[in-house]
């Protein structure tokens, strides 16, 4: 990081500072997700069609009040917790899912008994993927400055007290898996 600080542009230095601050937690989360992954491989789940990215930004409400799920480019066969993490854990720092929204979702989705270990695993994977990709975008000198600024703001949101990284850490704490 010292080399980055001495020779990099402002946005690379900014994201490097965030990364330095979060490095121990990122490393711990990676370790915990790896352990959960190994544990979950020993007890496979039923696979269902998952959207892969069903956050509020991928929902449309039509004039008749029907909800449409758009942007299916991340669709995958996976345990249902892969999508349920968006409703039960939330992934957008600026738009946490409320209990009323969860109730409305499950009224349409139907009864389900999600596995908290799978939820924590998928939250952790998503948090690691997001922090890595958005930090990379913020440091990418080939990107326009506005995109880099936006990426840095998203990194800040991920690491915020209500951000996805914090949610993933909380899910692991709830399981007794975060010291």
Each PLM stretch: what is its role?
Residues 1-51, 174-176:
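An alpha-helical support segment within catalytic cores of ATP-dependent transferases
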Residues 26, 54, 61, 127-133:
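Hydrophobic alpha-helical membrane segments, chiefly transmembrane helices and signal peptide h-regions
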Residues 7-18, 66-72, 84-90:
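Short, flexible active-site loops
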Residues 34-85:
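Active-site acidic catalytic loop and adjacent metal/ATP-binding pocket
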Residues 81-114, 124-142:
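Active-site activation/catalytic loop segments of kinase-like enzymes and analogous catalytic loops
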């Amino acid at each position: 990081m010292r080399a980055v600080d001495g020779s990099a542009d402002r946005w690379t230095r900014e994201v490097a500072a965030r990364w330095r601050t979060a490095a121990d937690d990122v490393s711990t989360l990676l370790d915990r997700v790896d352990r959960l992954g190994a544990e979950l491989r020993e007890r496979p789940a039923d696979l269902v069609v998952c959207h892969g990215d069903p956050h509020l930004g991928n929902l449309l409400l039509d004039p008749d009040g029907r909800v449409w799920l758009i942007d299916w480019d991340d669709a995958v066969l996976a345990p249902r917790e892969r999508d349920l993490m968006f409703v039960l854990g939330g992934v957008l720092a600026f738009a946490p899912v409320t209990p009323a929204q969860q109730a409305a979702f499950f009224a349409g989705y139907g009864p389900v008994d999600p596995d908290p270990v799978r939820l924590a695993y998928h939250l952790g994977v998503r948090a690691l993927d997001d922090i890595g990709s958005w930090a990379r975008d913020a440091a990418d000198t080939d990107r326009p400055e506005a995109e880099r600024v936006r990426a840095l703001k998203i990194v800040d949101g991920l690491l915020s007290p209500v951000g996805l990284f914090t949610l993933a850490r909380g899910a692991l704490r709830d399981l007794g898996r975060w010291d």
